[in-house]
A protein has these predicted regions:
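Generic N-terminal targeting/processing segments that precede catalytic cores or assembly contacts
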Residues: 1-354
Length: 354
C-alpha cells in the first residue's frame, strides 16, 4: 500500500492480528501531547456508549521509533497497538460466505481469501488513523487552528446544524469533551432510541457527522488534486464505512441558482467577511477564511444478525448468512473521532513549511 500525503502516512496490520500500527514523517522537535492523543483514542473507543461493540482493547500506543522523551527526533515515527480481545472463531462458520456489503467478496477475489474480522479493512484500523490525526491536531493547534464536530443525523434523528458563519472555538472544544457530542441536547434521546430499536431487531443504522475547522490561513490548499477538498476527501474516504462527503451546501447546490449559492463578500469592521457560507469555507480548492464546514455520511454497519442472502464461494451456490461476533449498531458514533482525525490530516497535508 502506498503511503498517503506529505507526511507519508502508512497503516498496517489487521483487526485479528496481534499488532497493528502506523508510520508517518514528522518534523523534529514536536512534543507529543499525551493528553490530546489519549482523549481522541478514548473518544474512538466509545466505552459504555449504546450501540458500540463490546470488544474491549487497551488501545495503548507503543512507540517503536521516531520519538525520544516524548519529542519527535525527525526520524520516521512508528507506533503500534496490541490486539488481544479478538475472536476468529466467530467467523469460522462463515469463512466462505461473504458478508453482504462488506469487503469480503472483492477481497476474496483480489487476495484469495476472506480476511478474518475484516483484516485491514476493519473499522478497528481507525485506531492508528485516530492516533495520526491526534498528532496532526497538535500541529494545527500550534498554528492557531481548531477542529471539532458533532453527530448530525443518526438513523433519521437530527441535531441542529452548525451556523455557517458563527462557529466558535469554545463550542468545538465543548463538543470534543462531551460523551455524546450534539448541539441540541434533546437530540440525544431520539438518536439513542433509533440505535436501540435497530439493535433489538438485529439491525443497524447509518448516520452522519458535521465537522468544522477554524483558523485556516486564507489560501491554504491549491488547484486540482492539491486542493483542500481533494486532500480532505481522499483521507476521509480511508475511514471504513464512509460513503459520502459534502462541503458547505454540498449536494443542495444542485437545486440552487448562482444568485442563491454565491457567498457575497463585504467589508465588516475593517475585514473581509462573507454574507453566507454555501461553499463551506473553500473556493478553488483553497481556504477563503470562513469556517470550513463539511458533513460525512456513514453507512449502516453491514455486519448484522438478521438473515441475509449471500453465496458459498467454495461451492458456488446461493446461501443465507447470519453474522455473529461483536459489532457496532451505528458506526457513526465512533466514526466521529475518526472523521475528525481525517480532517486534521487532510488540512495538515495542505500546510506548507512543515
Amino acid at each position: 500500500m502506498r503511503p498517503w500525503g506529505s507526511i507519508k502516512l502508512d497503516i498496517y496490520g489487521g483487526s485479528h492480528e496481534k499488532r497493528m500500527g502506523l508510520t508517518m514523517e514528522l518534523p523534529k522537535g514536536l512534543r507529543l501531547d499525551g493528553e490530546i492523543i489519549s482523549r481522541d483514542i478514548e473518544r474512538r473507543r466509545g466505552v459504555n456508549k449504546k450501540g458500540v461493540t463490546s470488544r474491549r482493547e487497551a488501545d495503548v500506543p507503543i512507540y517503536i521509533s521516531g520519538v525520544r522523551g516524548g519529542v519527535t527526533t525527525g526520524d520516521t515515527l512508528r507506533v503500534e497497538f496490541e490486539n488481544s480481545d479478538f475472536r476468529p472463531k466467530d467467523y469460522t462458520d462463515i469463512s466462505s460466505l461473504p458478508r453482504p456489503s462488506h469487503c469480503d467478496y472483492p477481497a476474496y477475489i483480489k487476495y484469495g481469501g476472506i480476511p478474518s474480522g475484516g483484516g485491514i479493512f476493519s473499522g478497528r484500523m481507525t485506531l492508528p488513523l485516530v492516533f495520526a490525526g491526534a498528532v496532526a491536531r497538535q500541529l494545527l493547534m500550534q498554528r492557531g487552528m481548531t477542529v471539532g464536530g458533532h453527530y448530525y443525523d443518526i438513523g433519521g434523528a437530527l441535531d441542529s446544524p452548525f451556523h455557517p458563519l458563527q462557529v466558535d472555538r469554545h463550542t468545538l472544544d465543548r463538543l470534543r469533551g462531551s460523551d455524546f457530542p450534539v448541539l441540541d441536547v434533546s437530540a440525544r434521546r431520539a438518536m439513542e432510541d433509533r440505535i436501540g430499536e435497530a439493535a433489538e431487531r438485529g439491525d443497524s443504522v447509518g448516520g452522519s457527522v458535521e465537522l468544522c475547522a477554524l483558523g485556516l490561513p486564507v489560501g491554504t490548499g491549491g488547484p486540482l488534486w492539491e486542493g483542500l477538498e481533494s486532500s480532505i476527501a481522499s483521507i476521509m474516504y480511508a475511514v471504513p464505512g464512509v460513503k459520502g462527503v459534502e462541503f458547505g451546501a454540498g449536494f443542495r447546490m444542485a437545486d440552487m441558482h448562482g444568485s442563491d449559492a454565491n457567498d457575497g463578500i463585504r467589508i465588516k469592521d475593517g475585514k473581509i467577511a462573507f454574507e453566507s457560507n454555501n461553499s463551506g469555507g473553500i473556493n478553488g480548492g483553497m481556504a477563503n477564511g470562513a469556517p470550513v464546514l463539511l458533513r460525512v455520511a456513514f453507512r449502516p454497519t453491514p455486519s448484522i444478525t438478521q438473515p441475509q442472502h449471500t453465496v458459498n464461494l467454495r461451492e458456488l451456490q446461493n446461501a443465507r448468512i447470519t453474522v455473529g461476533g461483536r459489532h457496532d449498531s451505528c458506526i457513526a458514533l465512533r466514526g466521529l473521532a475518526a472523521a475528525e482525525a481525517a480532517l486534521c490530516l487532510g488540512i495538515l497535508n495542505c500546510m506548507e513549511g512543515l
